[in-house]
């Protein structure tokens, strides 16, 4: 028995990825492509209805306190939360052709897209020490101003400069 994927699998490849020429999308099975979302929705519905009906029809009292209301409210909450699973399952099974997707949501240059791309590149830039920053970037300018790191095996010498005051009788300390 094969395990179902944890997330809904898309049928197309990402926009920048090369597509396989002979790979046709797999037809959706009877339950659709997002089986985990369907399983979540059904499980929450069953648990919610069981709690709700138990709270309505069972006389649950512990030490004189009635717990029917707690089960009714928690069951209603679980049934409401199952809507998220149903929405995920439904939206994961919507099929849109690549042509329709590009026609409706084609890449339009916008300031927001440029800003998102710039932030994404900056945040995902490799932080490894061996890789150099792009020339002209803020990181490259900062690296140019910073002193180079000390070489392996070198000693660090601290030099402190102080002002010297000439006392009476010192060379060059006469009045002119």
UniProtKB/Swiss-Prot annotation:
Protein keywords: Membrane, Phosphoprotein, Transmembrane, Transmembrane helix
Please give the residue ranges for the topological domain Cytoplasmic. 1-36, 91-176
Q: Where is this region: Disordered?
A: 1-22, 124-157
Compartment(s) where it occurs, according to its Swiss-Prot or TrEMBL record: Membrane
Q: Which residues carry this modification: Phosphoserine?
A: 175
Q: Name one GO cellular component term.
A: membrane
Task: Please give the name of this protein.
Answer: Transmembrane protein 238
């Amino acid at each position: 028995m094969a395990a179902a994927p944890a997330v809904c699998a898309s049928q197309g490849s990402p926009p920048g990825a090369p597509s396989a020429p002979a790979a046709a999308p797999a037809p959706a099975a009877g339950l659709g492509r997002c089986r985990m979302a369907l399983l979540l929705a059904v499980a929450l519905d069953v648990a919610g209805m069981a709690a709700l009906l138990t709270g309505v029809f069972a006389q649950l009292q512990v030490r004189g306190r009635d717990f029917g209301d707690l089960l009714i409210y928690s069951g209603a909450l679980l049934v409401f939360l199952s809507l998220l699973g149903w929405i995920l399952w439904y939206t994961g099974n919507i099929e849109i052709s690549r042509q329709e997707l590009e026609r409706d949501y084609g890449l339009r240059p916008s300031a927001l897209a440029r800003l998102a791309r710039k932030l994404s590149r900056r945040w995902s830039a490799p932080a490894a020490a061996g890789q150099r920053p792009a020339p002209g970037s803020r990181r490259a300018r900062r690296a140019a101003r910073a002193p180079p790191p000390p070489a392996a095996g070198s000693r660090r010498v601290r030099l402190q400069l102080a002002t010297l005051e000439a006392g009476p009788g010192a060379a060059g300390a006469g009045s002119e």
